[in-house]
Amino acid sequence: MTAKSRILVLNGPNLNLLGLREPTHYGSQTLEQIVAILRDQAQKADIELEHLQSNREYELIEAIHQAFGKVDFIIINPAAFTHTSVALRDALLGVAIPFIEVHLSNVHAREPFRHHSYLSDKAQGVICGLGAQGYEFALSAAIRALQAKQ
């Protein structure tokens, strides 16, 4: 019997405020609602899904380190850390787990400081501007990538 594939979904700072914070940019769904949809999608594909949201950079880095050898794919919305965190980039490169970067809003249509990502050039893909559905698309792509490896 083969072990189930495992996908880790990481969400960065302030995403715990989804549903309340700037709904014109981020939509009205809460993070809990988004994660529930992802869990259902993963279960249907016989995939284990883990989730962590943190406002602390070091907690996200620790989760990435702990994923080594245990997680097959990462979906990450680094939020504001996108534009500032070389440490997150280094952690992802260090564990060499494939990842997709997700953003609810179109970061390229917003303030200039949001246009640069420290992760995008190393990601398997980047999804932005599609709201909460972007997570579903990222999970579908991750599942397809894992199935192709089997």
From Swiss-Prot:
Annotated Pfam families: DHquinase_II (PF01220)
Active site: Y26 (proton acceptor), H103 (proton donor)
Pathway: Metabolic intermediate biosynthesis; chorismate biosynthesis; chorismate from D-erythrose 4-phosphate and phosphoenolpyruvate: step 3/7
Binding site for substrate: N77, H83, D90, L104, S105, R114
Sorted UniProt keywords: Amino-acid biosynthesis, Aromatic amino acid biosynthesis, Lyase
Oligomeric form and interacting partners: Homododecamer.
Listed name of the protein: 3-dehydroquinate dehydratase
Native species: Vibrio cholerae serotype O1 (strain ATCC 39315 / El Tor Inaba N16961)
